[in-house]
Amino acid sequence: MRPAYDDPRTTDQPITRARPPPRAARGRRLGEEPLTEHLVDPDVPRDLHAFIAGLPKAELHVHHVGSASPRIVSELAARHADSKVPTDPEALVDYFTFTDFAHFIDVYLSVVDLIRTPEDVRLLTYEVARDMARQQVRYAELTITPFSSTRRGIDEGAFMDAIEDARKAAEAEFGTVLRWCFDIPGEAGLESAEETARLATDDRLRPEGLVSFGLGGPEIGVARPQFKPYFDRAIAAGLHSVPHAGETTGPQTVWEALIDLRAERIGHGTSSAQDPKLLAHLAERRIPLEVCPTSNIATRAVRTLDEHPIKEFVRAGVPVTINSDDPPMFGTDLNNEYAVAARLLGLDERGLADLAKNGVEASFLDAPGKARIADEIDTYTAAWLAS
């Protein structure tokens, strides 16, 4: 019997809700499982990969444009022939190989430049949701940078309509609930902060799915305190604060995000491990870190996976969530990030289920929604272990 989940890279079949495959179906040939060869970590048992593939999940740190699959990127590049982005999906593998964080930003912005019409926005958003659903993502807070689109001439109202139309279609067709985080592209300065805050707080424009306000882009030379007035406005309008911090800079940046931007979660927070007082603060206040292991290696924020500080975070009692950041660009997906976490933390099925529930608990979903997904995780895990 074939598992009720499919590899988003190899099929366009309808998406169905996952259930644990029977024991006989586990360990079957590669190609019949949800992960492709290059994503199957040989240090993680095949049974555990199969468990992860069907595990209901929430994802809290994943970027809109950065989640565009090679197929969608190549389609958009073909639409806009003046772009330097390759139209061949195979060539994108080399194009998405980064020398450092600055190079990643350059490549990322070249893909951003492909999103030029409301139709591009809707296509991207809908297809990102489709890929999430195939990984059993029940709920996701997708980071969107509206400034990058409106400055390229997309009407702001049409932009909001496009993401909302895709959100509603995705929930109706795939069962995946999307919510938005509007983030400031830090490299674009205070002009982008003003524009993003306006779009996030203007009741005539603010989309129904918006729940949080963030800050992304390079950290070096982009001080967090300068964005305080814009976060204050967003928080006053009822949005949650979720800035990136401590990805490529030291723990002081995380402190600034906590103190000046009133962060409720920290994007990455990788350097927090360098400051015991900061770890204790995060643990005591139950402030989650949105950890993205493969991303940190791809951008050279961390040298190797074995050196990733996720183990220090867990030992210190800091709430940890697992995320994919910009998955196709980093040659990963959320299932693979769970497999990486399983290896680094020595997790079995119950440990992975607890990790998935961390993501649900740290989300901005309402209490009934959290309880529903947590119950689904428990039911799935119990059925798997009993089979």
Swiss-Prot record:
Keywords per UniProt: Hydrolase, Menaquinone biosynthesis, Metal-binding, Zinc
Annotated Zn(2+) binding sites: H61, H63, H244, D325
Pathway: Quinol/quinone metabolism; menaquinone biosynthesis
UniProt biased composition (Basic and acidic residues): 1-10
Binding site for substrate: R116, D183, G217
Catalytic activity as recorded in UniProt: 6-amino-6-deoxyfutalosine + H2O + H(+) = futalosine + NH4(+)
GO molecular function terms attached to this record: deaminase activity; hydrolase activity, acting on carbon-nitrogen (but not peptide) bonds, in cyclic amidines; metal ion binding
PANTHER family xrefs: ADENINE DEAMINASE
The protein's role, per its UniProt record: Catalyzes the deamination of aminodeoxyfutalosine (AFL) into futalosine (FL), a step in the biosynthesis of menaquinone (MK, vitamin K2).
Protein name from the UniProt record: Aminodeoxyfutalosine deaminase
Organism encoding this protein: Streptomyces coelicolor (strain ATCC BAA-471 / A3(2) / M145)
